[in-house]
A protein has these predicted regions:
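Phosphate-end processing signature that detects enzymes handling 5′-triphosphorylated RNA
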Residues: 1-233
């Protein structure tokens, strides 16, 4: 995930503002783990003959209840996706800025800063009558990429799982209404901001890695239902 130097989009998300954007580079698969250190703790990016990986430059925009996603597929060297290389931004900074400009987003100061890497496992489901989509995300991990931010931790784990529902109407179809019985409330949720908030909390806090305001009394899976979308990123 990328942001301004002063984390303006994170601030907007935490404040619940109706107009906000997320800039990220996404890729898929278990092989390229963004939290893993290479042997020796360093990596060389763009070695001649190195294999390339398809990644997606994405802008996700939310305006009140409406959200849109724009993305462009490009090739990046596999070594650019290792933890020690992520602060360089994966792709040339000019390519990211130019792509976001084509999408209608212009960063203050003319640059985006790599901030945090987030990965997760996901299962997708589709309600066949209405086309509502349900995703279940778990094993959510995050690593700080921006130097000097929070404690700079790597591989911080969010317990439990996130359930997200996306569809053409605000009310869920009858087939999905039993999801309300998982014991959670409907709310907006951002993996980006929730992970940054967890990294900013003190080590040892009881509910540090849980989504804000949600914690179970006993160990076990947590149900978190949201209409937002937000697996290496």
């Amino acid at each position: 995930y990328f942001d301004t130097v002063d984390l303006e989009e994170h601030r907007k998300s935490d404040a619940g503002e109706l107009a906000k954007d997320k800039v990220r580079i996404r890729w898929y698969g278990d092989e390229l783990d963004p939290h893993r250190l290479e042997a020796g703790g360093s990596s060389s990016v763009g070695v001649p003959g190195e294999r390339s990986v398809e990644v997606w430059l994405e802008r996700k925009s939310r305006r009140a209840f409406a959200s849109t996603k724009q993305r462009l597929a490009v090739e990046a060297p596999a070594s650019a996706l290792t933890f020690t290389a992520l602060e360089e931004g994966i792709v040339p900074a000019a390519l990211l800025v130019d792509t976001m400009a084509r999408f209608g987003l212009f960063p203050p100061g003319g640059r985006f800063c790599p901030v945090i890497a987030i990965s997760y496992a996901r299962c997708r489901f589709t309600e066949p009558v209405t086309g509502f989509r349900v995703s279940l995300d778990w094993r959510i991990r995050s690593s700080i990429v921006k130097p000097g931010l929070a404690l700079g931790e790597r591989g911080l784990v969010l317990p439990g799982a996130v359930v997200e529902i996306k569809g053409p109407a605000f009310h869920m179809p009858p087939a999905l209404r039993p999801l309300a019985d998982i014991g959670s409330s409907w709310t907006r949720y951002s993996k980006y901001s929730s992970s940054l908030d967890a990294h900013a909390s003190a080590r040892g806090s009881v509910s540090r890695a849980w989504p804000s305001g949600v914690m179970e009394r006993a160990p076990g899976p947590i149900g978190w239902v949201s209409r937002t979308e937000q697996n290496g990123e």
